[in-house]
Amino acid sequence: MAPSALLRPVSRLLAPARLPSGRASARSKFYVREPLNAKPDWLKVGFTLGTTVFLWVYLIKQHNEDILECKRRNGLE
């Protein structure tokens, strides 16, 4: 592959951004909305916190079982 072919995509990245011409540039494509954290979705918050608590409890329980198994195998108990 020729070096110029490799540099072509890089030169596009380094080139200054082109603004769209015509009427489209005068109107915003984005809508101004209320911030998402102004009105939280309590169902999602509950599921997220519940899942987090469940995973931590399961992790600690599994860790304790693994420690007991390790002690049993090594004859420490």
From Swiss-Prot:
Span of the signal peptide: none
Keywords: Electron transport, Membrane, Mitochondrion, Mitochondrion inner membrane, Respiratory chain, Transit peptide, Transmembrane, Transmembrane helix, Transport
Keyword 4Fe-4S: no
Transit peptide: 1-28
Alphabetical list of InterPro entries matching this protein: NDUFC1
Membrane topology: Single-pass membrane protein
Predominant subcellular localization, coarse grouping: mitochondrion
Residue intervals passing through the bilayer: 42-60
Coiled coil: none
Gene Ontology CC terms, in alphabetical order: mitochondrial inner membrane; respiratory chain complex I
Subcellular localization: Mitochondrion inner membrane
Assembly with partners or alone: Complex I is composed of 45 different subunits.
Stored PANTHER family: NADH DEHYDROGENASE [UBIQUINONE] 1 SUBUNIT C1, MITOCHONDRIAL, NADH-UBIQUINONE OXIDOREDUCTASE KFYI SUBUNIT
Function: Accessory subunit of the mitochondrial membrane respiratory chain NADH dehydrogenase (Complex I), that is believed not to be involved in catalysis. Complex I functions in the transfer of electrons from NADH to the respiratory chain. The immediate electron acceptor for the enzyme is believed to be ubiquinone.
Family membership: Belongs to the complex I NDUFC1 subunit family.
Protein name as catalogued: NADH dehydrogenase [ubiquinone] 1 subunit C1, mitochondrial
